[in-house]
């Protein structure tokens, strides 16, 4: 039996947690997630032309539907571009889940100049998020997604 990839586990976890729409911008580090989204008809994917738009679209979706909005962006400059929308959602107590890719594990925190590498991606978001997590292996995905959703539904998002 083939082993489930992290991308497949992520998409199935999002469906299980009730995510119906994902706003995002495809990129090399997250193409596996887009492939998994393509294979699962349970989530609608709306692509945009800038990561900031993805975050603002997730925010608007959350505010207009009362559901959690989800955005999918590339690491490094992608998550930094999304940070304005993330900060707006956080300041407004709007529930959005932002999923960012990451560079290859063998390049992580090595400062080698890998495409979209940022030494501490999570640190960039600490002042505009309630919860952040880093997932390194496929088995961690369901629990991490569940905890993120729990955080969004408990207290201030």
Where are these regions (language model features)?
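N-terminal alpha/beta PP-like core and its mobile active-site loop of ThDP/TPP-dependent enzymes
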Residues: 1-157
